Amino acid sequence: MHKYRTHTCGELNLAHVGLQVKLSGWLYRRRDHGGLLFIDLRDHYGIIQLVFNDDCSIIQAEISKIKFETVITVEGTVIARSNETINKNISTGDVEVVVSSYVVESFAEELPLQINGEYEAPEETRLKYRFLDLRGARLHQNIVLRSKVIQELRNQMLSNGFIEFQTPILTASSPEGARDFLVPSRLHPGKFYALPQAPQQFKQLIMMSGFDKYFQIAPCFRDEDARADRSPGEFYQLDIEMAFVTQEDVFGLVEPVLYNTFKKFSNYSITDIPFPRITYDESMLRYGSDKPDLRNPIQISDVTDIFQCSEFTTLKDSINCGAVVRAIPAPMSANRPRSFFDKMIEYAKHLGASGLAYIQFTNDGVKGSIAKFFDEALLARIKKLVKCQDGDAIFFICDKEDDATKVAAKIRAKVGEELNIIKTDCYKFCWVIDFPFYQLDSEVNKITFSHNPFSMPQGGIEAFNKAKTVEDLLSIKAFQYDIVCNGVELSSGAIRNHKPDLMYKAFAIAGYSKDEVDKQFGAMIRAFSYGAPPHGGIAPGIDRILMLLTNSVNIREVIAFPMNQQAEDLLMGAPSAVTEKQLQELQLKLISKERIK
């Protein structure tokens, strides 16, 4: 018989009745029924109930004093449970093991957190004792699922003819949107490596190298603040790049990969292929976001022109000063009590809006705070444009375009929540396309890249040459696209700019000199000068895919050893101080913030 186990704790069933077995695992739960002591033994594979009967009174006395999570090995006989004691909640619930002997492999101290799920410990405790937290069923299953999802993604890429690469972790710093993590060089004092924010340049260089289809389960490192869906420091993505492809070719690859993955690991309904394509401008108008949650059926409309024809003088004055009016329908809520509308108004004020107007299209006529300012013809125009019917209400927000867009998005989400019309058992995918190539940094009044600076501008270099004003430049679109699911951006991608003259021009408009471009992107520019294929790619975030599949509200629930909100690893004590000797080897010296000032 094996030293530790003949079977796992999750595999025993009625076919094993009468068998002598040896099992090892953690002491999970204990129940004393007076003469009979029941222990739930847990390992990676499941839970089995152990029985210590009164024939083993000495063993009972010993085992009853052992702390939870102590690791034990037991020998015993598998028996069938009586009908009234069968446990349908576990895979081994038809049987139990009558123990004849046991050995303690490792004693456990008093636990700082409970494993059996009776209450959840504070996050600081969970992260400090992550090895204990990972024993809990939900988190344990999430990490197992993570492995399966990565395997599924890898298998699909290989079946599509892709080659898996590993690109360098120590590389050069480049301006890709977030701060770099820097690594000082011992051999080259005063110089630093950077951990890659993404393998962006390397995967494009792989296309320059004559490879046709690249993928990588890629670690990415960004020194940025944490969010619920963003881990500080490190995250993983399915990095993809292909040569001689159009935007639609990329979509044609990614859609089945995501569809098949979500179909395999969830029973939710999934958007049929092809996924909807929504332009950036339409997304910002209809949903107030470039990450639309299509589970919410409400769409926002612009009704500025109609309001300008109304008798609503206050709003007309605002419109003449540059404001816009957005309409947010509230289906079948016209007859809701006044408290509903007051609640929405207070919510809008909480968001920073000066107020929130509304109209109710009831069966008895039109009501609401601003209905009196519109004649029947204008009301009919509003109703048609917003696609409302009798029984619906409409909320209106008036503000500068950026502010109106943000508030309307929040109101849309709140109305959907209040009316309980947001579906929860589906995955709604879409592509957001035609992003602006540039944006205006209002703080410094400077044109900057809105997304990836390596994207191909629609219209090529002619689009730059035709642009005579800032507005013309801001109207240029990129072959840039995002894949969004349930309001979560899973990935950005693009058809790349593979022409040196076009790249220099694009960077020059954003304020970069040729020397700066050569210094920061010299390797790629050189590669472009020796025959570069048209190419494009994308990189779906694996952590966010897992969040959706597990219904997790925080990305830390799908990562084995995450950092906290302050980018600290409480388990390992990182970041940590280093010795003076280590600093000397790197020719570095620490100085206080006061001295920097």
UniProtKB/Swiss-Prot annotation:
Residues that coordinate or bind L-aspartate: E176, R222, H451, R496
GO molecular function: aspartate-tRNA ligase activity; aspartate-tRNA(Asn) ligase activity; ATP binding; nucleic acid binding
GO cellular component, one term: cytoplasm
Binding-site positions, ATP: R222, D223, E224, E489, G541, I542, D543, R544
Catalytic class of the enzyme: ligase
Family statement drawn from the similarity comment of this UniProt entry: Belongs to the class-II aminoacyl-tRNA synthetase family. Type 1 subfamily.
The protein's assembly and partners: Homodimer.
Family matches, as HAMAP family: Asp_tRNA_synth_type1
Official protein name in the record: Aspartate--tRNA(Asp/Asn) ligase
Organism: Orientia tsutsugamushi (strain Ikeda) (Rickettsia tsutsugamushi)
Origin organism lineage: Bacteria, Pseudomonadati, Pseudomonadota, Alphaproteobacteria, Rickettsiales
The gene coding this protein: aspS
